[in-house]
Amino acid sequence: MLKKVSFMVDFVNFKRYNKQTFEKRWDGSVLNIVLVEPEIPQNCGNIARTCAATGSRLHLVKPLGFDISDRAVKRAGLDYWHLVEVSTYENLADLFEQHPEAAADCWLATTKAPQDYCEAEFHDGCWLFFGKETAGLPEDFRLTHYERCIRLPMRAEARSLNLSNSVAILTYEALKQLGFPGLKGTGEMAEQPD
């Protein structure tokens, strides 16, 4: 179950506050969403909102194509920023140095993948990597993790899906496989009229 916490992001310095409380918020699984060199602030904001709604952690690998304090980022994330744990890294090596476990249970979203995402088996705490909007993930990174590359099926004429849409699709597929831990599964509607 979701527990209320006080957690805020200082958009200027991008510091994390009250991390211990944040980590106690979920009793279930947590996904790690990694954006490698994202370029479009609105996508980052939308993805932050998806992370807030699902209890996923957001990891941003520099260089970023925007300032994290950009109004477009904040606006797209609405008032959900207090629900998101966000970390930044200088590069992929920095991320793997801080989180060596990421290499063991990662999935790389790429249009060049040999398998579609339905073949992936997602686990508690797995890491989902997404590349920048114009070029995707670096080729050497994809080749190193070739067996962990997955693709969202689409028409041959389409180059790719929007980054924030791709993140949402894979995040919810992973959570579906895990049984939607910690998420509210039903809404409350007015009674159906006779």
Give names to the regions the model predicted.
Residues 2, 6-194:
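Post-transcriptional modification and biogenesis factors for structured RNAs
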